[in-house]
Amino acid sequence: MSATLKDYLNKRVVIIKVDGECLIASLNGFDKNTNLFITNVFNRISKEFICKAQLLRGSEIALVGLIDAENDDSLAPIDEKKVPMLKDTKNKIENEHVIWEKVYESKTK
């Protein structure tokens, strides 16, 4: 069975963002663009409390997963040396502004 975000409402979730950041939070709302309203947000690796409430754009999200309430060790200590850093999934183009300048010039001629 495939889960939908509505199955995760008002539950603890793990969120992996496209920049590789991993968050633990409670999912309180979402929309058709996968924008998420989350509360009690923690960084998964450093255990640092980030904020009480946050709105994440759907374009920033790579994965949302449910945390098992019975075995919730999401904020248990982690040996950071053993955790591989997640690769950034953003599409980055070097000197992208130069490309867009050429596109603009070609359309204005």
Swiss-Prot record:
Record family assignment: Belongs to the snRNP Sm proteins family.
Subunit text: Component of the heptameric LSM2-LSM8 complex that forms a seven-membered ring structure with a donut shape; an RNA strand can pass through the hole in the center of the ring structure. The LSm subunits are arranged in the order LSM8, LSM2, LSM3, LSM6, LSM5, LSM7 and LSM4. Component of the spliceosome U4/U6-U5 tri-snRNP complex composed of the U4, U6 and U5 snRNAs and at least PRP3, PRP4, PRP6, PRP8, PRP18, PRP31, PRP38, SNU13, SNU23, SNU66, SNU114, SPP381, SMB1, SMD1, SMD2, SMD3, SMX2, SMX3, LSM2, LSM3, LSM4, LSM5, LSM6, LSM7, LSM8, BRR2 and DIB1.
Stored SUPFAM superfamilies: Sm-like ribonucleoproteins
Gene Ontology cellular component annotations, sorted alphabetically: cytoplasm; nucleolus; nucleus; precatalytic spliceosome; spliceosomal complex; U4/U6 snRNP; U4/U6 x U5 tri-snRNP complex; U6 snRNP
Protein name: LSM2-LSM8 complex subunit LSM8
Ranges for domain Sm: 1-70
Localization per Swiss-Prot or TrEMBL: Nucleus; Cytoplasm
Note: Present with 1440 molecules/cell in log phase SD medium.
PANTHER family: LSM1 (PTHR15588), U6 SNRNA-ASSOCIATED SM-LIKE PROTEIN LSM8 (PTHR15588:SF9)
InterPro entries in the cross-refs: Lsm8 (IPR034103), LSM_dom_sf (IPR010920), PTHR15588 (IPR044642), Sm (IPR047575), Sm_dom_euk/arc (IPR001163)
Function: Component of the nuclear LSM2-LSM8 complex, which is involved in spliceosome assembly. The LSM2-LSM8 complex plays a role in the biogenesis of the spliceosomal U4/U6-U5 tri-snRNP complex by accelerating PRP24-mediated annealing of U4/U6 di-snRNA. The LSM2-LSM8 complex binds U6 snRNA terminating with a non-cyclic 3' phosphate group. LSM2-LSM8 is probably also involved in degradation of nuclear pre-mRNA by targeting them for decapping. LSM2-LSM8 could be involved in processing of pre-tRNAs, pre-rRNAs and U3 snoRNA, although involvement may be indirect.
MF (Gene Ontology): mRNA binding
Keywords: Cytoplasm, mRNA processing, mRNA splicing, Nucleus, Ribonucleoprotein, RNA-binding, rRNA processing, Spliceosome, tRNA processing
Biological process (GO), any one: tRNA processing
